[in-house]
């Protein structure tokens, strides 16, 4: 994708942006170009950006003064009116009783809920992001010396912070970040919070800050550290999730998903015979014997349910839940006999984020080493909406998440493609908790 990085500037020429996504994301995945928006000619600058035909944009317009709050809010509204797709919205404002536009908001707390004396003067940052149609928040960080980005109180880019591990403060901060994310419709947000008092009332005061993720000096900010440590796949997976979530929420993949479901509905009567005696069936047999799948299993792209049947036939005591885009594929005796109810029908990337925890997650037949000829043949046979990809570079870039170990990574012949007369290869991969 071609992604624009939008930075607000005063009229004088200033130095380069401190944000550098190309340090984290390979150019083979996405291309980034920085566009500076002048405060005095913002609308003209945005009109020029529209001609650059970016697929999406990241909004890094930093508020540096009280006047900038209204300026950035107005520019953001103009961006949205021009149908520029923004991956984040760092400017959530509301009007105070005094008629001022502000980014600050308050959450009342009761004195007995927190040890107030220990928390006075402290400041915390919490990152939150969209995950499909759901949302998640990261571990909050408490700074030893903190300043915030609006220069009323500038927070430093230093990683000199400690993790907030104790409740109820941790839960309060994460809940606040999720509330701000929901209100901003923002893709991802970073919220700075502090403890404040007014008369007899105590409250957490929150400030929506411009996220400092993807900084030029790698892992020099809270955001970059927490993404690297807590988000499997790191910054690349984080950005891809933001893009995917935006696409899901916009509904732009609806036609593709419906088309794909129809393709597999038509294939369903022939699937069992096509799968028999293939590398796929042998791989699933081997996996069910060689690794522990006991407990609860989430089977993504479960198809006709033969993996769940294979587990049970090999004596595995597992409750298997399935997700598949094709209702026709799931009308099988394997599903009836081996899968929990309800079975979920729909795109797995949309449904998975709302699922409870499972002991194991299985994803079948998506890690494929596909040739260009195969990809083009699938489009010719099933239409442009039936897209396929070679996933090898994605696997390599994903790596091994923190706290996990890769116990299996094996390339094997998946099946024979009769249309092209070639063998399609795939990868069997397994991660386990370290």
Curated annotation (Swiss-Prot):
One of its GO terms (molecular function) is methyltransferase activity. The keyword rRNA processing does not apply. Disruption phenotype: Has no significant effect on the synthesis of 2-oxocyclopiazonic acid, cyclopiazonic acid (CPA) and their biosynthetic intermediates. InterPro entries: Methyltransf_25, SAM-dependent_MTases_sf. It is an enzyme of class 2 (transferase). Coiled coil: none annotated. Keywords: Methyltransferase, S-adenosyl-L-methionine, Transferase. Its EC number is 2.1.1.-. The keyword Manganese does not apply. GO terms for biological process: methylation. Belongs to the methyltransferase superfamily. Putative methyltransferase; part of the gene cluster that mediates the biosynthesis of the fungal neurotoxin cyclopiazonic acid (CPA), a nanomolar inhibitor of Ca(2+)-ATPase with a unique pentacyclic indole tetramic acid scaffold. The hybrid two module polyketide synthase-nonribosomal peptide synthetase (PKS-NRPS) cpaS incorporates acetyl-CoA, malonyl-CoA, and tryptophan (Trp) and utilizes a C-terminal redox-incompetent reductase domain to make and release the tryptophan tetramic acid, cyclo-acetoacetyl-L-tryptophan (c-AATrp), as the first intermediate in the pathway. This is Putative methyltransferase cpaM. The lineage of its organism: Eukaryota, Fungi, Dikarya, Ascomycota, Pezizomycotina.
């Amino acid at each position: 994708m071609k992604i624009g990085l939008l930075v607000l500037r005063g009229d004088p020429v200033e130095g380069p942006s401190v944000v550098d996504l190309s340090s984290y994301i390979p150019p083979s995945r996405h291309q980034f170009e920085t566009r500076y928006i002048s405060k005095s000619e913002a609308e003209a600058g945005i009109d020029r950006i529209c001609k650059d035909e970016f697929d999406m944009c990241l909004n890094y317009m930093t508020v540096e003064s009280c006047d900038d709050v209204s300026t950035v809010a107005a520019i953001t509204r103009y961006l949205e009116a021009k149908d520029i797709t923004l991956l984040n919205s760092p400017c959530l404002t509301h009007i105070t009783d005094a008629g001022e536009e502000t980014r600050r908001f308050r959450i009342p707390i009761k004195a007995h809920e927190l040890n107030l004396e220990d928390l006075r003067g402290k400041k915390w940052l919490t990152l939150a992001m969209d995950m499909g149609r759901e949302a998640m928040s990261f571990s909050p960080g408490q700074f030893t010396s903190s300043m915030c980005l609006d220069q009323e109180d500038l927070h430093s880019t230093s990683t000199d912070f400690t993790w907030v591990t104790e409740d109820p403060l941790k839960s309060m901060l994460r809940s606040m970040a999720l509330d701000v994310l929901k209100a901003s419709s923002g893709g991802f947000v970073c919220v700075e919070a502090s403890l404040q008092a007014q008369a007899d009332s105590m409250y957490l005061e929150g400030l929506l800050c411009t996220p400092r993720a993807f900084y030029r000096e790698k892992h020099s900010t809270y955001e970059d550290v927490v993404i690297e440590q807590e988000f499997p796949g790191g910054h690349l997976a984080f950005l891809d999730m933001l893009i995917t979530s935006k696409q899901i929420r916009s509904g732009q993949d609806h036609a593709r998903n419906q088309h794909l479901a129809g393709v597999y509905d038509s294939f369903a009567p022939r699937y069992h015979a096509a799968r028999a005696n293939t590398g796929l069936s042998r791989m699933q047999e081997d996996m069910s014997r060689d690794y522990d799948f006991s407990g609860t299993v989430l089977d993504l792209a479960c198809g006709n349910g033969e993996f769940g049947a294979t587990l049970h036939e090999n004596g595995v005591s597992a409750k298997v839940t399935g997700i598949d885009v094709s209702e026709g594929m799931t009308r099988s005796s394997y599903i009836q006999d081996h899968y929990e109810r309800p079975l979920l029908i729909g795109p797995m990337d949309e449904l998975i984020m709302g699922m409870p925890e499972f002991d194991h997650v299985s994803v079948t037949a998506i890690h494929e080493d596909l040739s260009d000829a195969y990809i083009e043949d699938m489009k010719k046979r099933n239409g442009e909406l039936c897209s396929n990809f070679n996933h090898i570079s994605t696997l390599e870039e994903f790596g091994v998440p923190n706290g996990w170990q890769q116990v299996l990574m094996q390339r094997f012949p998946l099946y024979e493609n009769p249309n092209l007369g070639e063998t399609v290869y795939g990868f069997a991969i397994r991660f386990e908790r370290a």
